[in-house]
C-alpha cells in the first residue's frame, strides 16, 4: 500500500513539473559528448530560439533520455544566456556528471533531447513564467 501511495504522489509531482514548462521556446539542434578528466564528460549543446523576443535571462533544463525513455540526465541552460530572436546558443558543460558517460556509448539516434523552459526574461523587461 505504501508503494502505491508513493507512486501516486510521484506521478502527481511529475505531472505538475511538466505543466510548468514550455517545450517550444528553445530547441536542441545538436549535441556532442567527449571524455574529460576522471569520470567526467564534456557536453556541448546547440540550441535554437523560437522566442518572439530576445532573451536576457532564462531558467531552463535540457533533458537527455535513451530510446527506451530511460533518463540519462539533465543540464541547465546558462541563466544569463543572451539569445537573439531566431538565434542560436551553445552551452558547454566541461564537467557534466558521471552518468552522462552514457552519451559516449550510445548512438546519437538512440538519444532523445528536449528543453524545458520554466521562466524567461526578455530584453524588453517582460517576463514569462510557465
Put a short name on every predicted segment:
Residues 42, 57-61, 112, 117:
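Exposed beta-strand and adjacent loop surfaces of beta-rich binding modules
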Residues 72-105:
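Intrinsically disordered, low-complexity Pro/Gly/Ser/Thr-rich segments with frequent PxxP/GP/PP motifs
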Amino acid at each position: 500500500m505504501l508503494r502505491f501511495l508513493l507512486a501516486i504522489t510521484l506521478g502527481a509531482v511529475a505531472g505538475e513539473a511538466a505543466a510548468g514548462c514550455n517545450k517550444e521556446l528553445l530547441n536542441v539542434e545538436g549535441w556532442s559528448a567527449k571524455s574529460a578528466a576522471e569520470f567526467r564528460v564534456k557536453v556541448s549543446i546547440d540550441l535554437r530560439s523560437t522566442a518572439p523576443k530576445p532573451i536576457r535571462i532564462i531558467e531552463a533544463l535540457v533533458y537527455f533520455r535513451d530510446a527506451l525513455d530511460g533518463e540519462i540526465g539533465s543540464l541547465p541552460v546558462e541563466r544569463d544566456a543572451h539569445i537573439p530572436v531566431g538565434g542560436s546558443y551553445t552551452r558547454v558543460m566541461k564537467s557534466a556528471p558521471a552518468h552522462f558517460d552514457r552519451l559516449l556509448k550510445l548512438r546519437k539516434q538512440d538519444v532523445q533531447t528536449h528543453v524545458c523552459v520554466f521562466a524567461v526574461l526578455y530584453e524588453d523587461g517582460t517576463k514569462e513564467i510557465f
